[in-house]
Amino acid sequence: MTKRTKKAGIVGKYGTRYGASLRKQIKKMEVSQHSKFFCEFCGKFAVKRKAVGIWGCKDCGKVKAGGAYTLNTPSAVTVRSTIRRLREQTEG
């Protein structure tokens, strides 16, 4: 396992290099890219990052394209909610 501390966490491997604000940004990205996400297909928290923008569910085996560090990018969430809202307006 790599070097880490209680406060710095996953970015403890960088030591005092690169500045505190940059390390905080990197910490947010690295924590999200290594965490498990909810699978829309099987309903379990089993989706992990395979490569940049490729996410796969360990349980059901489905593979989904997403963001580089998170499963759903903020713009994709906005587009999805807009499409859902427009679909509801046309139906009702």
UniProtKB/Swiss-Prot annotation:
<feature type="zinc finger region" description="C4-type">
    <location>
        <begin position="39"/>
        <end position="60"/>
    </location>
</feature>
<dbReference type="GO" id="GO:0008270">
    <property type="term" value="F:zinc ion binding"/>
</dbReference>
<keyword id="KW-0687">Ribonucleoprotein</keyword>
<dbReference type="GO" id="GO:0005840">
    <property type="term" value="C:ribosome"/>
</dbReference>
<dbReference type="InterPro" id="IPR011332">
    <property type="entry name" value="Ribosomal_zn-bd"/>
</dbReference>
<dbReference type="InterPro" id="IPR011331">
    <property type="entry name" value="Ribosomal_eL37/eL43"/>
</dbReference>
<keyword id="KW-0689">Ribosomal protein</keyword>
<keyword id="KW-0863">Zinc-finger</keyword>
<dbReference type="GO" id="GO:0003735">
    <property type="term" value="F:structural constituent of ribosome"/>
</dbReference>
<dbReference type="GO" id="GO:1990904">
    <property type="term" value="C:ribonucleoprotein complex"/>
</dbReference>
<dbReference type="Pfam" id="PF01780">
    <property type="entry name" value="Ribosomal_L37ae"/>
</dbReference>
<keyword id="KW-0862">Zinc</keyword>
<comment type="similarity">
    <text>Belongs to the eukaryotic ribosomal protein eL43 family.</text>
</comment>
<dbReference type="InterPro" id="IPR002674">
    <property type="entry name" value="Ribosomal_eL43"/>
</dbReference>
<protein>
    <recommendedName>
        <fullName>Large ribosomal subunit protein eL43</fullName>
    </recommendedName>
</protein>
<keyword id="KW-0479">Metal-binding</keyword>
<dbReference type="GO" id="GO:0006412">
    <property type="term" value="P:translation"/>
</dbReference>
